[in-house]
């Protein structure tokens, strides 16, 4: 969480921070995308992060809606975005990772990486649906030299091993004991 915004960490000094470099980069990038006429989905696994982003968007006068597990009337939020009332939809992984059709979106921003790479890959599918007539651009915001970078490395390593096992190539796959251990180990425990 500290990579997303220090205010998410349960340390008093961190909560006194007014913003983060990542949040500033996000708002700058989002402003550019909206200036290009983009309609944007923003995914985060942290509802508190979405609340911070929402507060700043409101302060900047950017109309948006937010969907988290606590949201009521989910369909009204979706309709608001799909009907063009707002151009930004903030969505938590758990509340919006599946079951939404948001074909008005042409841009997806992953504010933070997820341990579950499959869920992260499904998020852009909210925009890639039957009825989508435009290309969908997917952007990932990651803090260099941080735990986020390590998470991405672990995701890639597991994906490569899975591709080797279940990929399109025909033939016998030979795995070393370390490969099997790496494939089966939880991401958090991999070294």
Language model regions located:
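SF2 helicase/translocase ATPase core recognition
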Residues: 69-72, 76-77, 81, 88-175
């Amino acid at each position: 969480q500290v990579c997303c915004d220090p205010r998410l960490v349960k340390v008093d000094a961190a909560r006194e921070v007014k913003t983060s470099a990542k949040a500033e980069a996000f708002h700058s990038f989002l402003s550019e995308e909206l200036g290009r006429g983009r309609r944007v989905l923003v995914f985060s696994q942290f509802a508190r992060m979405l609340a911070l982003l929402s507060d700043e968007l409101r302060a900047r006068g950017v109309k948006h809606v937010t969907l988290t597990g606590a949201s009521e009337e989910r369909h009204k939020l979706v309709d608001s975005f799909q009907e063009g009332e707002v151009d930004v939809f903030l969505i938590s992984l758990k509340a919006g990772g599946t079951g939404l059709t948001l074909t008005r979106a042409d841009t997806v921003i992953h504010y933070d990486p997820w341990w579950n790479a499959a869920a992260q890959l499904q998020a852009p599918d909210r925009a890639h649906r039957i009825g989508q007539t435009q290309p969908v651009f997917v952007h990932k915001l990651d803090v260099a030299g941080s735990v986020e970078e390590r998470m991405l490395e672990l995701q890639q390593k597991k994906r490569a091993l899975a591709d080797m096992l279940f990929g399109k190539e025909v033939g016998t796959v030979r795995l070393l004991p370390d490969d099997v251990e790496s494939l089966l180990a939880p991401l958090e425990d991999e070294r």
